[in-house]
Amino acid sequence: MTNLSKVTVGYDTFTFELDDLKTAVIGGYNASTGENSGMELVNDCYAEHQVNPDIIIAPGFSSDPEVAAVMAAKAGCINTVFKGRAIIDADCETTKVYSGVPKWKNDNSITGERQILCWPMMKIGERVFHLSSRLAAIMAATDVDNGDCPSKSPDNKELGATSLCLKDGTNVVMNLEKANYLNANGVMTGLNFVGSFKAWGSHTACFPGSSDPVECLIPVARMFDWVGNSLILTYWSRIGDKLDRRLCESIADSSSQWMNSLTAAGHLYGGRVEFDEGENSEKDIMAGILKPHVYMAPVSPLVEVNWIQEYDSSYVTGALGS
């Protein structure tokens, strides 16, 4: 083996136009070559790696409303059957004050149930990072620690930041009042309130326009995605089997047992799978189309605690022994 005492690396400087980069990130399908690019590459992940990407990020580009819209659309239709979420960064260059984020959000139509919006950026030392990249990592790590199940919220999890900041590195001081204002407008942020910097918020970007927990609460929404994706993969091997009563009962029984196991593990309040004859017409059955109905209630995250205090004079009587 040759010992190297010095290695010299040379490189060229490449200059790209922002619009060119944006176009590359959005990508598309090339009918001439049959190749995907940009966001369309999400559809190639499972085919090539047997991994379903359920979190989509584009740090540095997602604050563009066109990119954010494409991310949300792709998250809602991965390989035509799977579903996921897109984490979007609000603009930290023009939106410099927390109170202006809701207006930016609405003006740029970042209000979809499949979008998770965050503001501002964060620092580790002097390095500046987009919050979406950190939130994606937090969500993935939380899922792994939770048995590879997304029933826990990224809310109040370690952010690993030393400060919050704007794009130019200007520090942003985020107190509880400001953080809760952002949360109330469907924006996740960071907060250094008790202990260290934590991710703060459990709502998707559709909040407060929608208060449906399936749409607006991150872990509840992700559980619906995950259960749906898991059922598709689990019963994919049954495609081609005879569509008879035995098959229907087998799918309903085994999937309901799985839902029971999720309930026992604390991921669901409860769940079951049934076949409704009204939803499975004779025409569909003859065409080989089956529609199992999944009923489920994922466990909600704790969002707010309101302590109620009352003076109870009976303790005085008991203490004085009268």
Label each residue range with its predicted role.
Residues 1-24:
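Surface-exposed interaction regions enriched in Ser/Thr/Asp/Glu
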Residues 217-278:
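Acidic, low-complexity glycine/serine/threonine-rich segments
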